[in-house]
C-alpha cells in the first residue's frame, strides 16, 4: 500500500503521569518522577528509579481487574496505555488489526516472587515475554495478529517499524504498537552489576555525570494508512516518517 502512515491515537503511563494530559502537565512543570522505590521490594531500594506511582492493586482497580487475580505489572501498565490509545483513535480489535508490543522481561516480576516465596508453578508461563502481550490482547479482544518484539532498548521502536511494514504490505489496516515494561529485581541487579547506576538522579549532560536511572512504564500508538484513517473520519495526530 502506498501513501503515508499516520498516528491516530496515543497512550502512556509513566513515573510522571497516567495518560498524556497528566504527563504533559508534569513535563511543563519540570516534575521529576525519579525517586526511591516504593512498590518494588528489593535490596537496592536506595537507588533512584522512575517508578509508576501506583501499586499493582491500584492498577488493577483502574482497569477493572479482580484484586485476587495474578497479573504481571507489565501487563497492567500495557493495558492502561493501549486503552488510552485505542479510545483516542476510536478503534477496536478486528481481523485486520494487530497488537505489537515490545518488552524485555515480560512477567518476570511474578516469577521472581514465585522463586522467592513459592507458589503456583504454572505461573512460570508468565516468564515468557509474549505472555504479557497475549494478556493485553485478550483484555481488548479481536486482534487478528498479536506479536512481541524483544530487542532490549529498541523493542518499542522496532514494534512501530514492524507495524508500519504490515500496513504498507496490506496485511493490516490498524496497528497498535509500542512497548511496556515494569521494574524488577532483575533490572536493578543486572544494571547494578555493570556499575552504571547513579546513586543520585542522573545528569546525562553534566561533566560529572555518573550513570543512569532505570524506569518503568508503557507507551503505545495507533497506526493506520492516511487513506484508511480519513475514510473512517479519524483526525491524524502525526505522520510516521
Where are these regions (language model features)?
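Beta-strand segments within the central parallel beta-sheet cores of soluble alpha/beta enzyme folds
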Residues: 6, 96-101, 147-150, 172-180, ...
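Phosphate/pyrophosphate-binding loops at sites that engage ATP/ADP/AMP, CoA/4′-phosphopantetheine
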Residues: 83-97, 139, 228-235
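Acidic, glycine-rich active-site loops and adjacent beta-strand->loop/helix elements
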Residues: 11-13, 103-106, 151-155, 179-184
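Condensing-enzyme catalytic core mediating Claisen C-C bond formation in acyl metabolism
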Residues: 4-8, 28-38, 201-241
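Short, well-ordered amphipathic alpha-helical segments that serve as non-catalytic structural scaffolds
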Residues: 77-89, 130-132, 224-226
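Conserved catalytic cysteine-centered active-site region
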Residues: 1, 36-80, 96, 106-117, ...
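Flexible, low-complexity linker/loop segments at domain and module junctions
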Residues: 1-7, 93-94
